[in-house]
């Protein structure tokens, strides 16, 4: 059936198009600008206003993002400059210290930049980025050891709950070995605080009364810590630690080796709490035929298994010579092997100190080993009763070598960080060497023959 005057129905979702003016060409739409970063070949149409029945192009178009200046790769931000400056101060101090040593002639001279400004100007993007990462590593190493230190930077403990504590004290006569032993206990550098201290000497009669009183006073002082409102807090399970003096011959009695024997004086004390055994002036006795090495390795574990209250076992032995010739039973050799700590007086003979440093610094650069020897030499010329401590099993690598000062306390020497900084100096030296080699090769090619 034919219908007249009806428009065909519009398709669904189809918008009405504006009718173009007769005799007028359809206006070309404005060009569409887009960011060259978008690689879409068929982008979606951009929504715009209806141009109206006149068919004119819209007056507004999508504007291009204004061009940004290219960022230079060799420009450092403020944080990077701060990192490089901080690292440069450390490198400059280490370099000047190494140059001022008496043994600096034996070291390989390292090339370096003349100043910080020269480093920032001529260092190059790659080297400066490496230095930023190296300084971040140094900061991480310092932050790792910070929880183990007090607010003033000193160590809060010598063993940090490591047990058993087997330590050897090396020092000549008059260097303050007895005072050092008392200070270790009175300043609570050995934790936990021992409740019974055994003082072993060749003969009991050779201990002066003044020294006995000093021992009793200082171990009692180390048993307490200051509390709030002027109070004191006991650091162990007793109000007054026991001080027991013994002769060396009583130490080596057979029943003192058996922890199940009721006559064992060490087992009786271990049943109450931690103990400490101090051997002073006993080097000649240790070099005899009677073996006492059980006190250094087997005895601590037996006491701890049988007496749970014995949470701490400390043995400190005094030696006047780092390499005694008389050691028939092997006690001194076994003691050095089992020892966890070596407390060394800088007044020891230089040949013995150099031998010890060469033995226990195999993993350090040669320059840092020479620096450690120079530290020993420097403190040997002073009158302070200071000590340098080597820890075989430190709580952190930075605490492996420490310096004990009567006023400053136990300070870490951070030889691991000094070794890291020396490797950075070597990296700068290699970079400058490579540049010099490339410059010589370039000039050789450009020079007419």
UniProtKB/Swiss-Prot annotation:
Cellular component terms (Gene Ontology): host cell nucleolus; host cell nucleoplasm; viral capsid; viral portal complex
Region annotated Disordered, chain positions: 1-78
Region DNA-binding, residue ranges: 440-449
Predominant place of localization: virion
Localization (cell): Virion; Host nucleus, Host nucleoplasm; Host nucleus, Host nucleolus
Any Pfam family hit: Adeno_IVa2
Any single biological process term in GO: DNA-templated transcription
Entry keyword annotation includes Hydrolase: no
Keyword set, alphabetical order: Activator, ATP-binding, DNA-binding, Host nucleus, Nucleotide-binding, Phosphoprotein, Transcription, Transcription regulation, Viral genome packaging, Viral release from host cell, Virion
Induction data: Expressed in the intermediate phase of the viral replicative cycle.
GO MF, one example: DNA binding
Superkingdom: Viruses
Keyword tRNA-binding: no
The protein's role, per its UniProt record: Component of the packaging machinery which encapsidates the viral DNA into preformed capsids and transcriptional activator of the viral major late promoter (MLP). Binds, along with packaging proteins 2 and 3, to the specific packaging sequence on the left end of viral genomic DNA and displays ATPase activity thereby providing the power stroke of the packaging machinery. The activity of packaging protein IVa2 is stimulated by protein 33K which acts as a terminase. May be the protein that pumps DNA into the capsid powered by ATP hydrolysis.
Subunit structure, as described in the record: Homodimer. Part of a genome packaging complex composed of packaging proteins 1, 2 and 3; this complex specifically binds to the packaging sequence on the left end of viral genomic DNA and performs packaging of the viral genome. Interacts with protein 33K.
Protein name: Packaging protein 1
């Amino acid at each position: 059936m034919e219908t007249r005057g009806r428009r065909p129905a519009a398709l669904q979702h189809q918008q009405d198009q504006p009718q173009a003016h007769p005799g007028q060409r359809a206006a070309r739409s404005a060009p569409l600008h887009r960011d060259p970063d978008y690689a879409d070949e068929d982008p979606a149409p951009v929504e715009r206003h209806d141009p109206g029945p006149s068919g004119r192009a819209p007056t507004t178009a999508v504007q291009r993002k204004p061009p940004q200046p290219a960022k230079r790769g060799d420009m450092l931000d403020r944080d990077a400059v701060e990192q490089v400056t901080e690292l440069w101060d450390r490198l400059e101090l280490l370099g000047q210290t190494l140059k001022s040593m008496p043994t600096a002639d034996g070291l390989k001279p390292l090339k370096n930049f003349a100043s910080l400004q020269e480093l920032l100007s001529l260092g190059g993007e790659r080297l400066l980025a490496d230095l930023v990462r190296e300084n971040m590593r140094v900061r991480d190493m310092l932050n790792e050891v910070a929880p183990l230190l007090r607010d003033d930077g000193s160590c809060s403990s010598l063993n940090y709950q490591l047990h058993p504590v087997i330590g050897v004290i090396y020092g000549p006569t008059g260097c303050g070995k007895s005072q050092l032993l008392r200070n270790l206990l009175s300043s609570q550098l050995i934790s936990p605080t021992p409740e019974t201290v055994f003082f072993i000497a060749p003969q009991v009669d050779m201990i002066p009364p003044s020294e006995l009183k000093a021992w009793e006073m200082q171990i009692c002082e180390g048993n307490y810590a200051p509390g709030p409102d002027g109070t004191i807090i006991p650091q162990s399970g007793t109000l007054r630690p026991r001080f027991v003096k013994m002769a060396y011959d009583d130490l080596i009695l057979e029943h003192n080796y058996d922890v199940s024997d009721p006559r064992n004086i060490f087992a009786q004390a271990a049943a109450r709490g931690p103990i400490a055994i101090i051997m002073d002036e006993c080097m000649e006795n240790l070099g005899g035929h009677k073996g006492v090495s059980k006190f250094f390795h087997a005895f601590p574990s037996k006491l701890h298994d049988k007496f749970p209250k014995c949470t701490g076992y400390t043995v400190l032995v005094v030696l006047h010579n780092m390499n005694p010739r008389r050691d028939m039973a092997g006690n001194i050799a076994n003691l050095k092997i089992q020892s966890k700590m070596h407390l060394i007086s800088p007044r020891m003979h230089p040949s013995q100190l150099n031998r010890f440093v060469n033995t226990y610094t195999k993993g350090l650069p040669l320059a840092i080993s020479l620096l450690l020897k120079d530290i020993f030499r420097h403190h040997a010329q002073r009158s302070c009763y200071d000590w340098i401590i080597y820890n075989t099993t430190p709580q952190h690598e930075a605490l492996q070598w420490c310096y004990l000062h009567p006023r400053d306390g136990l300070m870490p020497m951070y030889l691991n960080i000094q070794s890291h900084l020396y490797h950075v100096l070597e990296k700068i030296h290699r970079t400058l060497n490579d540049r010099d080699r490339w410059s010589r090769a370039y000039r050789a090619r450009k020079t007419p023959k």
